[in-house]
Amino acid sequence: MTAFTTPSAPGLSRRALLRGGLAGAGLLTLAACRSAADTASSAASGSAGPRRGGVLTVGTGVDFTPSLLFAQSANTLVQRLVFNTLTRYDDRLQPQPELATSWQLAADGTGITLKLREDVLFHSGRRFTADDVVFAVKNLQNPARSAQLRSTAATVTDFRKNGDFELTLVLAHPVSNLFDLFEFMIIPDSATVEDAVAGTRLVGTGPFTLTERKPGSSITFARNEKYWNAGRPYLDGVEIRIVPQAESLLSSLKTGQTHLSYSVRGKDVAALKSDPQFRIKQYDTGSGAYYIGANLTAEHVSDKRVRQAIAWAVDRDRLVQQALGGYGTVSSVPWPKSSPAYSEAGAGRYSHDPDKARALLKDAGLTTLTLPFAHSNEPGATAIAQILQYDLKQVGIETVLQPTDSPTMQKQLISQTMPALWTLSHGFAQLHPATLAVSAYPFNEARNSSHFSSPAYTDVVQKAWNRPDSDSPEARALYQQITDVLLDEEFVIDLAIAGLVEVAGSKVRGVDLNKFGYLNLDDSYLTA
């Protein structure tokens, strides 16, 4: 995504958190705004407004990986179809009600009391209660779930129930990203959670129920007739089709077999932009940042001069234009422009300068070297890897490309078994800045994919995280220190910031994504 619509997203001030009791009104306002927008859009297309019925088909290049249900992975389309979260962010990172209707933060930031909806049923017919929130938090605390926000979930040390629909979470210390956890944490059914991670059964409280899963082919869902959001969903069902070939995905969109996709290659999106059959939407979440990762246990890349040389070698502008179709912003830092951690100086720190790259390699005693370079075997990711391979070759760094399927790469990230270099995209910078450094596998100060460790990095990250605010001058100063470490050490070499790009057929309305890319179809419908 090129940029946010606002120069900076406000942090979660104590006042904003304490007025959570008014958030229900905010939810109604947002729903009204969304309905108004959809109505206006429908009027323009000759439709009378929201229409019940129909099955929405979604095309994606990567299959759903059930074992990563509770982690951020390459396919997060399923989560919000089947499940709900406690709260959801609006465009200004202000939490709005979902399963939690209101909240009250303790004055010292070490606890939060949640009031919960009383009209929610799981797909099995069981009533949702505070016990399910307790289970959801403990589920993310389980290391087996590989949840990136496990560290934030782990700050919850006690649960105090006041009946079935009020719960206080007691925290070990204040954290600046508590509502990031609530946006991320889906509420599963405790009785079937092991079936969920095995991919045999998904039971939640969400708008759709799983009807069939064909691994590598498709996943189908039917409307939840007992959904708590009255009158929703409009759709009869949803089918997610796995289409790994870029040309096949593009063809299925053009022929109308697929209504919606977030997996279209940048160059194909650019070609569709002027086609009236499609509506192109950039999500201004900055939820994806393309990067090169370095495994510091590997020969040569353990020297930060080599990593800095790589940062100077890459032509980021060409990468954005050729591989992303112009849908991205060149950046040396992970932060989108909306983040309180963003600065123009940081974003522009590394530009395309092959001479500087060669000089750094020479300082490191190298003129040429050969390194393994892993990348996702999806077409778009392969195109990015090939551009990077060319740039590195120009300064004397030969790379051997290692195409790998996305689930395997995710497991390698988690297990710290990446080769010397790899390229992927990361999230978590679109939220409160501390979340990136305590949650994202490439950046986690305690245990990251690069095997990077630094007392200074750990200290500043913990200071930024262990505070109730995220946007004060003191917090911003800590974010700058984190950025300084990242730009100097370059164990993660950021290249470009881009959000998801939605390609939708002209009949599709009301689609939304949350900050983690969970597909929300509560208000979606197909025009006649």
Locate predicted features.
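Periplasmic binding protein-like
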Residues: 56-59, 390-444, 474-478
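N-terminal lobe/hinge region of extracytoplasmic solute-binding protein
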Residues: 59-107, 138, 203-204
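Extracytoplasmic/peripheral linker and loop segments enriched in polar/acidic and small residues
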Residues: 398-403, 407-409, 438-505, 528
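Surface-exposed binding/hinge segments that line
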Residues: 115, 149-191, 212
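Ligand-site clamp/hinge motif
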Residues: 226-271, 398
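Structural transition elements
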Residues: 325-363, 380-383, 470
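Alpha-helical secondary-structure segments
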Residues: 129-136, 164-168, 206-207, 235-237, ...
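Gly/Pro-rich hinge or "lid" segments in bacterial periplasmic/extracellular proteins
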Residues: 94, 182-233, 237
